[in-house]
A protein has these predicted regions:
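An acidic-aromatic
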Residues: 114-192, 246, 253, 260-266
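Gly/Pro-enriched, hydrophobic low-complexity segments
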Residues: 109, 128-141, 153, 211-285
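Short, exposed beta-strand/loop patches in secreted or surface proteins that constitute
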Residues: 89-93, 117-122, 141-146, 206-216, ...
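C-terminal motif of bacterial Sec signal peptides marking the signal peptidase cleavage site
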Residues: 19-23
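Alpha-helical transmembrane segments
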Residues: 14-18
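Bacterial Sec-dependent N-terminal signal peptides
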Residues: 1-11
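N-terminal leader/targeting segments and the immediate start of mature chains
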Residues: 24-126, 270-297
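Flexible, processing/modification-adjacent segments and terminal tails
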Residues: 82-88, 148, 153-221, 226-229, ...
Length: 297
């Protein structure tokens, strides 16, 4: 299944509350805070959709604008992360030591015939990512990094195009794949320190650009908070007038061509509690060696 690595990285940055803080933002901004939706909440650990309610003060007030193939932004000054809406999310994560965010990718997945829903969670040094269909009731894959056991698991489910592609490949190679009716998994070592799974890498004074972001799919205008990483990539956090986080946008610019590319996810919910069982591998999953019988000749 094709999955946007950039938007997953942005989402994880939000989930991990700047433990990958090349991708977290803050600020104020202003205009008509619209909302957009597709899909429903995933039942893993969260059901509310909220964020901060106060906005930061800006230190300047220019009003330039830029546009891309997906959205239009305006510039309304800068602030620091500590004074921003996103800073409120960060502080909630730091206070609780855990967070779960549910997103729906706005790019259609042709392989699985859906707008993928992603559930991303952090608890201590454990990280979880689930990809499902838009409504969240059909799971395609899970990525589990267990900070307590230092083990990682990737689990693929029979309902996914990826799983069926693997099954087809082994079948064409003469293997007996009759047992491939349950999830399969691969295990790998996980070092949370190397992966940056920490809530300590946090700069309250990080610069945040304030403004607005217009979502071209429905014309909604959001308060935007943008952080630019050392590579020039922008992570844009979009809030409605109530302070709820509605969109995560990752914007990159090709240095040679100047082409702007965006990956966008619709935020369905954020909560600050995560069920520990989320980080345990599905007991029904098997290894491929258990499910595949090689050809005899």
């Amino acid at each position: 299944m094709r999955l946007s690595k950039r938007i997953a990285a942005v989402a994880l940055a939000a989930v991990m509350a700047v433990s990958m803080l090349t991708a977290c933002g803050g600020g104020g901004g202003g205009s008509n805070g619209g909302s957009s939706s597709s899909g429903s909440n995933n039942g893993s650990s969260s059901s509310s959709s909220s964020s901060g309610s106060s906005s930061g003060s800006s230190s300047s007030s220019s009003s330039s604008s830029s546009s891309s193939s997906s959205g239009t932004t305006t510039d309304e000054g800068t602030t620091t992360l500590s004074k921003s809406r996103t800073g409120i999310i960060v502080n909630n994560v730091l206070k609780n030591g855990q967070v779960c965010i549910v997103l729906v990718n706005d790019e259609y997945d042709e392989d699985n015939k859906t707008y993928p829903q992603q559930t991303l969670a952090l608890r201590g040094k454990s990280i979880y990512q689930k990809t499902a269909n838009e409504s969240g009731d059909t799971v395609f894959s899970e990525l589990i990094n267990d900070g307590e056991t230092n083990k990682g698991y990737y689990v693929s489910y029979p309902e996914s195009a990826e799983y069926q592609g693997v099954k087809e490949l082994y079948t064409k190679n003469g293997c007996n794949t009759d047992k491939m009716t349950v999830p399969y998994y691969a295990e790998f070592p996980y070092d949370p320190d190397k992966e940056g799974a920490s809530l300590n890498n946090f700069d309250q004074n990080q610069k945040v650009e304030l403004g607005t972001y217009t979502y071209k799919k429905n014309g909604a205008v959001y308060h935007s908070e943008t952080v630019t990483d050392k590579y020039g990539h922008k992570s844009i956090y979009c809030y409605d007038n109530s302070g709820s986080l509605k969109l995560l946008v990752e914007r990159t610019v090709d240095k040679e061509t100047g082409k702007v590319d965006e990956s966008i996810a619709i935020v369905k919910s954020i909560t600050y509690s995560v069920n520990p069982s989320l980080f345990k591998r599905n007991p029904n999953a098997k290894t491929l060696d258990e499910l595949i019988v090689p050809p005899t000749n």
